[in-house]
Amino acid sequence: MNKKSLPLMALRDIVVFPGVIAPVFVGRQKSLHALSNTTLSEEDNSKYILVTLQKKFDQENPNRNELYDVGILAKVIQIVKLPNTTAKILVEAIARVKISNIKGDEAFEANYEIIPDEEIFDANNMRSLVDNAVQLFAKYAGSDKKINAEIIETINKEISETSNFINIINILASHLITSLEEKQRLLEETSPFKRISTIINILTSNIVNSETEQALQQRVKKQIEKTQRDYYLHEQMKAIQKELDEDKSDLAEFDKKIKAAKLSKEAREKAEAELKKLRTMNQMSAESGVTRNYLETLLSLPWGKYDNSKIDINQAEKILNRDHFGLEKVKERIIEYLAVLQRSSKIRGPILCLIGPPGVGKTSLIKSIAEGMGRKYTKFALGGVRDEAEIRGHRKTYLGSMPGKILTQLKKVKTSNPVMLLDEIDKMGSDFRGDPASALLEVLDPEQNSHFVDHYLEVEYDLSNVIFIATANSYNLPRALIDRMEIIDISGYMEEEKIQIAKNYLVPKQLKMHKIKKDEITISDDAILDLIRYYTKESGVRSLEREIGALTRKALKQILADKKVKHISVDSNNLEEFLGARKYNFGLAEKNDQIGSTTGLAYTEVGGELLTIEALSFPGKGEIKTTGKLGDVMKESAMAAYSCFRSRAADFGLKYEDYKDFDVHIHVPAGAIPKDGPSAGCALFTTIVSLMTKIPVRRTVAMTGEVTLRGNVLPIGGLKEKLLAASRGGIKTVLIPEENVKDLKDIPPNIKSSLEIIPVSNIDQVLEHALTKKT
């Protein structure tokens, strides 16, 4: 075909199909110019124009690259100019065309070439597809309320007036409710079969969506009608009850409870006011539910209810000794506390706080205290608590509000004088929701807790009869909180104590738990000692109990699997057969006296340990280097020890030239374990002196103590645990600070008898006992 040129107009929101007459609103300048450039055709004295869809709807002035290259050759049937410089035109789409060579600035003009439809070879198949599409369109138009009835009638008329399949397809396509991009793809498609198939798919999808939307609307309508009906029936029932003057049983029950409860004057007035308010409320309202919950909570608290406890310190002492081995000083302090309570029902002394590592029996001690006092026991776990409302409660204006855990626990035990454990008090945090530690100050202060006000209750509640006892693993507590409590340290158990606990408590408990008779298994003391040393590493006995449990299960399995086995004996020789290879090792003394290697003593959260400190020297700048994952305090101890050595080098027969060009590298194995603290000063100094003087350190000597720059030895902590580690590791002599001699009275006699304990006050005394010869 010959190419021709015509004005081109970009359409924003409509795709016109061949054979369809469509109205077009023209408002953009380029479109108006293109319309004015149309001229009368010589053939039929009509105006023709090219129209095509722009690719982006919101593009105000699209360029030639932003127009689709397949459009329509249209005849302008009518032009109506509107007052606001716009126009409305009526166009008849003549044919689909390929647009090319677009040009022009004020108005587009382009060449075009008509694109014919492909020939229809199977008329019968096409007829059935077209009929199917027409039926689907009628069904969709009938189900979708968005399509006007007049439009449906017009479309049906257009379809009935033509027998041309292509025209029917174009009429259906022009009235489809789908995206402009989808319509443009239909226009560009030259195959009638593909076009009608796409139309059928779109209509089918639209029908499914329409039916789904209608079903959803119907369900929503029914739900609204049901809600309105229920509300009407409730209101009608209330009106009938009011006419009959019937009492509301639940409100009458509240009234009885208020009269029967031993409420304080303030609480009674508050309860009566809330009940009066509840009587006038709509029972279906949200506020009614809030008020009802408040009254239920207020009346469920144990107002004026106390256990008739009678403290007998002799009986309490028996209970403590029955449930706990060792811990003599701790039990003595608890008995003193109970003795004061026996004489005075209202104690104004400090709150007890038991501080010690996990598994040493802090929680079970408090249970025994409650039993010894004849009071109920309750627990408030503070670990991870960050919200102040956990202590003081939420104000009842908030959705889902409730009282704090203090009052919740009292409600649970139904008494106002229980023993309440504040567990893991050192694990509390604080964030934007408040500081629970500060909220606890009021609870733990004997001068204030008789007037404790929970935010939810909004009335005072007397907590002065509650015995609060806290537990913690460390001293990481706010200063103000520590001031309100008396700290009782619970150190870890000695090996001998663990053996007795295992024999008298843990083994019988596990045998009973696993239904094993005493004559079916025997665990020797040596096996228990190996369990403690090689399968656990703790201050308490929790892991020990787990290992004993594993041991008894293995034994039970053997007994049940082999009927010939009637008794199993476990000792140190066959322990690994039950529990596998050893998990831990403890430090042992060196096999030989070493130069530049000293045995120190460390105190960790799992007990005492031998700490090997070694050093090397090599050419350098006279500097000191430390490795072994040492903390800041221990690094500073090493620097202080090195400075002390350099100031005394002449006393050891060394000249400045002997060490000024040498670096000292101090290492503390194992390198992966963090270490910190000042008590390694003596060992660090001895290591440096031994290295520089080439005098070995006695392998049977261990030491602990902090060293000052002037060579004085300062006291340390954890002496009992350190001496136990020394005795266990084959150490014969231990050097301790002279100021720690007072602590030796707390050391078990068997430990003191196995060691030569030498007090030292300065570094000269340390070197005298530690080095194999005098410097």
Swiss-Prot record:
Swiss-Prot/TrEMBL keywords: ATP-binding, Cytoplasm, Hydrolase, Nucleotide-binding, Protease, Serine protease, Stress response
Biological processes, Gene Ontology terms: cellular response to heat; protein quality control for misfolded or incompletely synthesized proteins
EC number: 3.4.21.53
Keyword Nucleotide-binding recorded: yes
InterPro entries reported in the protein's UniProt record: AAA+_ATPase, ATPase_AAA_core, Lon_bac, Lon_bac/euk-typ, Lon_lid, Lon_proteolytic, Lon_Prtase, Lon_prtase_N
Molecular-function annotations in GO: ATP binding; ATP hydrolysis activity; ATP-dependent peptidase activity; sequence-specific DNA binding; serine-type endopeptidase activity
Domain Lon N-terminal per the UniProt entry, residue ranges: 6-207
HAMAP family for the chain: lon_bact
Name of protein: Lon protease
Taxonomic source organism: Rickettsia bellii (strain RML369-C)
Lineage of origin: Bacteria, Pseudomonadati, Pseudomonadota, Alphaproteobacteria, Rickettsiales
